[in-house]
Swiss-Prot record:
Residues annotated to bind N-formimidoyl-L-glutamate: Y158, N336
GO terms (BP aspect): L-histidine catabolic process; L-histidine catabolic process to glutamate and formamide; L-histidine catabolic process to glutamate and formate
Pathway: Amino-acid degradation; L-histidine degradation into L-glutamate; N-formimidoyl-L-glutamate from L-histidine: step 3/3
Name of the protein: Probable imidazolonepropionase
Length: 426
């Protein structure tokens, strides 16, 4: 006997919709999220949300329908799956040995000059095979999943030359096809640092004349599927004009611009984003008032990474001012060997404590707005009819426990496209 529907999530104390019909939220909208008390959600055979409403109205409306599975969520909260707007998950070799240096006061640039930092990771990643990198990636994705993350932006960037950069993008493409729990939107980051033996101009030429043409060839052949191009815009790395050239070359082959900016120095990132029509900028600790206004006008998403400010003891980006000016604010973990965080609940907590965002704003930034920052909010980031049924169930009657309980939130189940992909009973 066939069933009318795949799944019914029944009588959740709080069913956190986020927003109805908006691709992202800005300003005061971020504090006004949509919640259905005692809510029920109906999911079809394709893993799409078919209907959502109060328990009472859904029971009456679907009393004659059959369900393959009914999950009683009395006393529980249901939220959208979290979207991590900025990760570097493909790498070999940890950097635990650098943590003591940082605690003793070494800056990011000090570690870099001592032969650590990104160059350490690059050498290890270059020497790893595609299969070795894939085997390292999957446990990381599983740890993200158990923390409620169902969609990530994921970068290359630990090659700085054609072969390794393409190898990393192939690993991400393979995981995207074979790992069902966490969906991946990949980003090409050939301009993450200056390779040894080159200056910035030479590195820029290599990216534009060698790496991007090979990326286009592999993309056209279906071997990789990058959606974005990223550059580390920073003094001593890729500065304004080089960054602009690289981003434009990516735009010319259909990639969205989603770059690192204004982290350690003010580099006119917001202004550049306005000039090129960029989708998103990450970090922004040093962004200017004019830069924020340019981002609000475009609009360009601010993907804020409180883990980085926390671990490097940097000043935090001006999240409150961004929200006041109408910049769309998203969150990311910045998971990488320097900031080893796989938990969006912890990121949301840090956003509240360090960046003075309220809990509603943090949740919007880690769901709908993060999805929009990677052009996925038409299908992800909120619990709306027609979107994928990616959601997290909490063993708590108030959704705020996901932030309040910080590093060990009471996540009982995670669903991806209507399929159970994590249960704490397992």
């Amino acid at each position: 006997m066939g069933f009318d529907f795949k799944l019914k999530i029944s009588n959740a104390s709080q069913l956190v919709v986020i927003s109805k019909g908006k691709p992202f939220l800005i300003g005061k909208e971020m504090s006004n999220i949509e919640i259905i008390e005692n809510g029920t959600m109906i999911i079809d055979e394709n893993g799409i949300i078919f209907d959502i409403g109060t328990f009472k109205e859904m029971e009456e409306k679907y009393k004659d329908k059959s369900f393959e599975k009914v999950l009683d969520c009395t006393g529980k909260s249901v939220l959208p799956g979290f979207v991590d707007g900025h990760t570097h998950p493909v790498f070999s070799g940890d950097r635990v040995h650098e943590f003591a240096m940082k605690l003793a006061g070494a800056t990011y640039l000090d570690v870099h000059k001592a032969g650590g930092g990104i160059q350490f990771t690059i050498s290890h990643t270059k020497n790893s095979t595609e299969d070795e990198l894939y085997q390292l990636l999957i446990p990381r994705l599983n740890r993200m999943l158990k923390n409620g993350t169902t969609l990530i932006e994921a970068k290359s960037g630990y090659g700085l030359e054609t072969e390794t950069e393409m190898k990393m993008l192939k690993v991400l493409d393979r995981a995207s096809k074979q790992f069902q729990g966490v969906e991946i939107v990949s980003t090409y980051l050939g301009g993450h640092a200056i390779p040894k033996g080159m200056n910035a101009s030479e590195a820029t030429d290599d990216i534009i004349n060698k790496q991007i043409p090979e990326l286009k060839r592999l993309k056209d052949a279906g071997e990789i599927s990058p959606a974005n191009i990223d550059v580390f815009l920073e003094k001593g790395f890729f500065e304004y004009e080089d960054t602009k050239r690289i981003l434009q070359a990516g735009k010319d082959i259909g990639l969205e611009c989603n770059f690192h900016g204004d982290e350690l120095s003010y580099m006119k990132s917001g202004e550049l984003a306005g000039e090129l029509g960029c989708r998103a900028i990450s970090h922004l600790e040093k962004v200017s008032e004019d830069g924020m206004k340019a981002m609000a006008a475009t609009p360009t998403f601010a993907v804020l990474l409180p883990t980085t400010a926390y671990i490097l003891r940097l000043e935090c980006p001006p999240a409150r001012r961004m929200i006041e000016l109408g910049v769309p604010v998203a969150l990311g973990s910045d998971f990488n060997p320097n900031a080893h965080c796989l938990s969006m609940p912890f990121v949301m907590n840090l956003a509240c404590v360090l960046m003075k965002m309220n809990m509603n704003e943090s949740l919007v930034a880690a769901t709908l707005n993060a999805a929009a920052s990677i052009n996925k909010s038409s299908t992800h980031g909120s619990l709306e009819v027609g979107k994928f049924a990616d959601f997290v169930i909490l063993s708590a009657d108030k959704w705020e426990h996901i932030i309040y309980e910080m590093v060990d939130p009471p996540i009982s189940h995670v669903f991806k496209k209507g399929n159970l992909v994590f249960s704490n009973n397992n």
